[in-house]
């Protein structure tokens, strides 16, 4: 154990952006690590974390820094609300599960909700998404029940408890539908989702990606307009964490793996063709290089980006730090999600 601790201290001390995020210098990393090990050392926490599939480096590279930000925010803000954004497949749900466990270890009780929970019921959602050229009826702006989401955030801010709808992706042959609701109580609200914090953007001639059809370009512009409806929701958040892939094409590989797990569990899952169309729809609806810009200072009362993290193709953390410390994937890589090349992704 002493040798393992020494190696970990050495590895963490070399990560300049990681230390900047946590306000540490090389000399204080060892003492900081000992405090975290004390907090995480109970059998209950160890067993709960072991039950969450993750790469070993994710604990110290992503999970602990994020829960430290949450703890810091909780000390200064009553009933804080934070957003967690990342393209499909980055492991936001897993990260949310980890925050629920780690929050308890650090002395607070987070409510973890997904923007997917707030999808409109299928008939209403299908009607709202009828103009979608990808024939996908969940995911893009306009498919969420913003009235319920805003009510959840406001009820939590006022009372520390709220109602969150449940969405079952396995219903309706993989299209998914609402399945009741759950009452939650806590002292921190974490909202995760692929488009959390996304803002209206000015679409250019190569948006959403080079080679897009006229219908896809029109859909992209429409979704940008619809993002204006989400602005008041994002203003209810105190900060954002962005988790991004090293290359945009990793997202399809991760979603293929997720659908395979869904299929093995006996639940409805999307076919390969449906999945390609879904990912292409996501990119056309909210191009992350346009709608999520971590270095842009909010001027509309929106939440600031507090932390960014980059994952490689195996979901290993390769960089983490404050905005500007992590490289943003080049917009040109978005062409990997275009109709002509999406089948070769991954």
Q: Which ranges hold each PLM region?
A:
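Conserved lysine of the Walker
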Residues: 92
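N-terminal pre-Walker A segment at the start of P-loop NTPase domains
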Residues: 49-74
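Conserved nucleotide-sensing/catalytic segment adjacent to the nucleotide-binding pocket
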Residues: 53-54, 111-114, 118-172
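Walker A (P-loop) phosphate-binding loop of P-loop NTPases
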Residues: 89
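Phosphate-binding/switch loop-helix module in NTP-utilizing enzymes
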Residues: 152-198
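Short hydrophobic/aromatic beta-strand immediately N-terminal to the Walker A/P-loop
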Residues: 83-85
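Hydrophobic positions on the alpha1 helix immediately C-terminal to the Walker A/P-loop
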Residues: 95, 99
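Conserved NTP phosphate-binding and transfer environment spanning the P-loop NTPase/kinase superfamily
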Residues: 2-37, 60, 195-346
């Amino acid at each position: 154990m002493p040798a393992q601790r020494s190696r970990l201290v050495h590895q963490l001390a070399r990560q300049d952006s990681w230390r900047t995020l946590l306000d540490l210098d090389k000399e204080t990393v060892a003492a900081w690590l000992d405090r975290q090990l004390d907090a995480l050392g109970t059998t209950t926490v160890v067993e709960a974390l072991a039950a969450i599939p993750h790469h070993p480096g994710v604990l110290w590279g992503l999970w602990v820094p994020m829960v430290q930000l949450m703890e810091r925010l909780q000390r200064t803000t009553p009933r804080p609300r934070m957003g967690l954004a990342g393209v499909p497949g980055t492991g936001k749900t897993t990260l949310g599960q980890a925050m629920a466990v780690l929050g308890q270890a650090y002395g607070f009780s987070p409510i973890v909700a997904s923007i997917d929970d707030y999808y409109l019921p299928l008939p209403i959602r299908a009607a709202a998404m009828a103009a979608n050229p990808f024939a996908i009826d969940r995911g893009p702006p306009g498919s969420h029940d913003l009235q319920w989401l805003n009510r959840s955030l406001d009820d939590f801010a006022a009372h520390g408890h709220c109602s969150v709808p449940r969405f079952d992706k396995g219903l309706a042959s993989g299209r998914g539908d609402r399945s009741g609701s759950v009452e939650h109580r806590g002292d921190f609200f974490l909202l995760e989702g692929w488009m959390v914090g996304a803002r209206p953007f000015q679409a250019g001639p190569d948006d959403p990606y080079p080679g897009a059809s006229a219908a896809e370009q029109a859909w992209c512009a429409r979704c940008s307009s619809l993002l204006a409806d989400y602005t008041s929701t994002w203003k209810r958040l105190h900060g954002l964490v962005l988790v991004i892939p090293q290359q945009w094409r990793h997202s399809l590989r991760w979603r293929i793996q997720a659908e395979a797990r869904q299929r093995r569990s006996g639940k409805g899952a999307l076919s390969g063709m449906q999945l390609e169309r879904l990912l292409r729809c996501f990119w056309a609806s909210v191009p992350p290089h346009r709608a999520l810009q971590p270095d842009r200072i909010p001027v509309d009362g929106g939440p600031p980006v507090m932390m960014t993290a980059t994952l490689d193709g195996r979901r290993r953390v390769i960089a983490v730090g404050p905005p500007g410390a992590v490289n943003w994937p080049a917009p040109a890589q978005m062409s990997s999600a275009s109709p002509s090349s999406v089948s070769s992704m991954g």
